[in-house]
Amino acid sequence: MTAEPTVAARPQQIDALRTLIRLGSLHTPMVVRTAATLRLVDHILAGARTVKALAARTDTRPEALLRLIRHLVAIGLLEEDAPGEFVPTEVGELLADDHPAAQRAWHDLTQAVARADISFTRLPDAIRTGRPTYESIYGKPFYEDLAGRPDLRASFDSLLACDQDVAFDAPAAAYDWTNVRHVLDVGGGKGGFAAAIARRAPHVSATVLEMAGTVDTARSYLKDEGLSDRVDVVEGDFFEPLPRKADAIILSFVLLNWPDHDAVRILTRCAEALEPGGRILIHERDDLHENSFNEQFTELDLRMLVFLGGALRTREKWDGLAASAGLVVEEVRQLPSPTIPYDLSLLVLAPAATGA
């Protein structure tokens, strides 16, 4: 039996209990996501500051909306500026649609990522089986679901591109393109990374390899950017031989979607398509050590498990994957972001025979 706590020990146990309840809460994350989905902060900033006005704007029941708003005040996202009138706090302002941090879309339950986060409700299944849970909720694997839902596909591409600096500009600036003639961006989305390279290095041409559902979006984006003469888009499958050789092959937020054996298959295809002296550039999150318990790293790692069966990799894991594909990690460059609370990395891989 556990001994009865002393009077002196009880406050510490109460604090521990409060911490556990906060960490285990499902209602607070759903309240925040509901506020994002309803665009409450945008409506407030547009002048709808009362429950009645907000209910009219959001097509919700005033009495139910008030209960939501009361919790938003309790957790510090809203405050009562005058009796019955609410305004966002500094934290709440992050849920404005035009905020540079772009958090409203990430928390909107109708958008691709927040919708997929519902997969976490079946996390025990993923831990028992090592397999994703997304399909058990939505009936199709993640990318197959996106392919059949153009709205979700557009949402996903937009979310990945929402931080222009960390998504494209920072990695494009981190590499010397002097000796690169052609870049192949494998799984390159709408072409933002390839476009950033093309703008920075006018002598470089590029090819974006993507699935059918994204090809038209990428072509339209590159045309609007005035780069369609230098960056072409090809429909294809990166498990098959790649459509052409290149001096630099980019994998930006691709391998984290796949378990190790599939990641090795993708890397092997990329290695086959390298021109002599070429390099593979992997743009993702990595962690220095196996025993690093970084909250953002572990959270995204679990998200990849329940969405796709993929994983984030530590430095040791990257070395192992590279070796399995006949490659070596030549260098790693950290890419700090001004708008997200963690750094990303650009890993440079070379054929093992030439790598350092």
Swiss-Prot record:
Keywords: Antibiotic biosynthesis, Methyltransferase, S-adenosyl-L-methionine, Transferase. This is Carminomycin 4-O-methyltransferase DnrK. Its EC number is 2.1.1.292. Involved in the biosynthesis of the anthracyclines carminomycin and daunorubicin (daunomycin) which are aromatic polyketide antibiotics that exhibit high cytotoxicity and are widely applied in the chemotherapy of a variety of cancers. In vivo, catalyzes the transfer of a methyl group from S-adenosyl-L-methionine to the 4-O-position of carminomycin to form daunorubicin. In vitro, it also methylates the anthracyclines rhodomycin D (10-carbomethoxy-13-deoxycarminomycin) and 13-deoxy-carminomycin at the 4-hydroxyl position. It comes from Streptomyces peucetius. It catalyses: carminomycin + S-adenosyl-L-methionine = daunorubicin + S-adenosyl-L-homocysteine + H(+). Belongs to the class I-like SAM-binding methyltransferase superfamily. Cation-independent O-methyltransferase family. Substrate binds at D163, N257, R303. Pfam families: Dimerisation, Methyltransf_2. S-adenosyl-L-methionine binds at R153, G187, E210, D237, F238, S252. GO terms for molecular function: methyltransferase activity; O-methyltransferase activity; protein dimerization activity.
